[in-house]
Amino acid sequence: LSGVESVSYGSDNPSSGNTWSSNFALGRGSEDAPVHTSLKFCDADYFKTYGLRLKAGRIFQPGDTLGELIVNETMLRKLGIHDANEVLGKPLRLGSQQWHEVVGVVEDFNSHSLHNELEPITMGSRKEFYNVVGLKIRPEQMAATTASIQQLFDATFPEQVFDGQFYDESIAEFYRDENRFALTCKGFALLAILISCLGLFGLASLMAVQK
């Protein structure tokens, strides 16, 4: 489809709020304290599709062994490292047996709402955890391309229901309750203003009668 700029596969989108988690320790010593981190799984095109920028190192490559990891800046700080290049090639230990090599550092991004603190995030490329297809669509072809994607999906998977969602819509869900509260507050404010106006009108009428 000409309207699609890039396609990626992943366990979820960057700000879905739905993540696995685990504990990783830096180095091979048993004395290294593990860091609790959220886990995301994605392919190499994930970073381009969602606009995630690398701080150091590289993204995943076809020849990787699936043991390579990319961490965010917050994870880097939790590991006690301040230079992004310093962690490249270092082993991260999962449990007591599994070793993984850090090949890249990605700039911090919000995986939840802006009310949540930035959290440590570790990213791997294991395909068995891919649940979501992400597509970056050219804005000027948005409507036509979206319709074509749904038609293609329905023709390929006739027994499945197309469940597509724009990225900004998924982010907006974080603030749905706040928007409802804001609308309620506006209603109360309007009511309060109206009551105040009625009160002023009544006072003015009373003063007019007294005169």
Q: In which residue ranges do the predicted regions lie?
A:
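Residue-level recognition of transmembrane alpha-helices
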Residues: 73, 166, 185-188, 198
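Mid-to-C-terminal secondary-structure elements
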Residues: 2-177
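Intracellular coupling helices
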Residues: 198-211
